[in-house]
Amino acid sequence: YSQQQQRKDTLVVTRDGTGDYRNIQEAVEAVRAFMDYTVTIYIKNGTYKEKLVIPSWVKNVQLVGESAENTIITYDDHANINKMGTFRTYTVKVSGNDITFKDLTIENNAAPLGQAVALHTEGDRLMFINCRFLGNQDTIYTGSEGARLLFTNCYIEGTTDFIFGPSTALFEYCEL
């Protein structure tokens, strides 16, 4: 077999078990480290309650939801749980480079009891297309100086300091 035939470049996540994986973290962990080709993870509509981490060795991945309104990644940590502090409250943490999110919702649905990050970014060249980010305080943390982020056609909801951090981020055609 050639290398092209051996690699799997499309994975499917479904809550009902009809796809390759039942949760998104398992699909991310199945991606080979430091790939030079793109893997697309298709995520079917559903609510995925998980604390998703995309590590630094995962790159060139697209996470594509079935719809922004009905493909939901959610968690409910907040800064006042076990003295967690702001930066460990994320629902999704992206440390890998060249990662794209499309047509999905990332939310931190913690009660308004303190900081509760929905998206924590540390990777470079991250793109978010037609996504929704829902939270209260500190919804999006752009965590790495020099990193470049693009948000296009996104909806971002929060109450206090809901976008913060040192990265360079461009928000085009977004509703805040």
Model region roles, listed by residue range:
Residues 15-17, 40, 59-115:
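Right-handed parallel beta-helix/beta-spiral solenoid domain characteristic of secreted/periplasmic
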Residues 16, 44-46, 131, 154:
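Active-site-proximal beta-strand/loop segments in catalytic clefts of secreted hydrolases
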Residues 1-5:
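Bacterial Sec-dependent N-terminal signal peptides
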Residues 22-33, 48-57, 63, 73, ...:
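Short, T/G/N/S-enriched strand-turn elements that build extracellular solenoid repeat scaffolds
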Residues 85, 98-176:
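Right-handed parallel beta-helix
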Residues 8-42:
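Acidic Gly/Asp/Thr-rich repetitive segments characteristic of extracellular carbohydrate-active
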